[in-house]
Structures are given as structure tokens and as C-alpha cells.
From Swiss-Prot:
Molecular function as annotated in GO: rRNA binding; structural constituent of ribosome
Protein function: One of two assembly initiator proteins, it binds directly to the 5'-end of the 23S rRNA, where it nucleates assembly of the 50S subunit.
Gene Ontology cellular component annotations, sorted alphabetically: large ribosomal subunit
Protein name (database record): Large ribosomal subunit protein uL24
Disulfide bond residue pairs: none
Organism: Ignicoccus hospitalis (strain KIN4/I / DSM 18386 / JCM 14125)
One record GO biological process: translation
């Protein structure tokens, strides 16, 4: 599915809402901390389960925790400790947009993630 070249905001939004899951990973980018940015030479990476993030905007600003779940359909992440009480009195995760967090520690850097880092490092130079 090609990315639309239209300037119309409505068509841009339509693409975001109807994008297939394999393209939604690109929407899950979050900036890296200064230390990680210097170490890897990359400004942003897609958030994954197991990454440690610091929330920089919203109700839970300043909270740091590990990513418990990544929801590609809703384009939200769920961080340990960022919970609210629902109407039944149970704790549930508060959905956070990935652009509102900073990755402070990468969980697992496997072959696929290393490939992404190498590819993006070339683009930055």
C-alpha cells in the first residue's frame, strides 16, 4: 500500500486510520534519549515491548517504566505504572501515544532491530 501523495488532510487521516498493520510500525516511532542517540547515531526508533521509556507529556509526565504492551491498531503503548482505575475499581493501563515518550533503554536489540538501526544511521549522515 503506497503512502498517499495527496496534500489533503482528510486523505492523510484516512490513510492513517486504514493503514495495514505492517505499515503501522512506522507510526510507533519514539525519540531516543541523548545517551542512546549518541550511542546508536539514530534519533528515533519504533517502540517495542520491553523498552524502558520516560513519559514527557500528559497526566503521567515524568513517570518511567517498561512498555507492557504495544497496540498497533490504536497506535498506543501501555507503560507499567501508568494505570488508572476503571468504573469497577480495577487498575488498567492508560494508553499513551509513542511520540509523547522518550526511550531511555532499549529492551532487546535483535537482528531485525540492529538492521533498522544500521539503515537509519546511513540516512542520518
Amino acid at each position: 500500500m503506497p503512502i498517499p501523495k495527496s496534500k489533503k488532510p482528510s486523505k492523510q487521516r484516512k490513510f492513517l486510520y486504514n493503514a495495514p498493520l505492517h505499515l503501522r510500525h512506522k507510526f510507533m516511532n519514539a525519540p531516543l534519549s541523548k545517551e542512546l542517540r549518541e550511542k546508536y547515531g539514530v534519533k528515533r526508533l519504533p517502540v517495542r515491548k520491553g523498552d524502558t521509556v520516560k513519559i514527557v507529556r500528559g497526566k503521567f509526565r515524568g513517570h518511567e517504566g517498561t512498555v507492557a504492551k504495544v497496540d498497533l491498531k490504536k497506535a498506543r503503548i501501555y507503560v507499567d505504572g501508568a494505570t488508572i482505575e476503571n468504573s469497577r475499581g480495577e487498575q488498567r493501563f492508560y494508553p499513551i501515544h509513542p511520540s509523547k515518550v522518550i526511550i531511555t533503554k532499549l529492551g532487546e536489540v535483535d537482528k531485525v532491530r540492529q538492521k533498522i538501526i544500521e539503515r537509519r544511521k546511513k540516512e542520518v549522515k
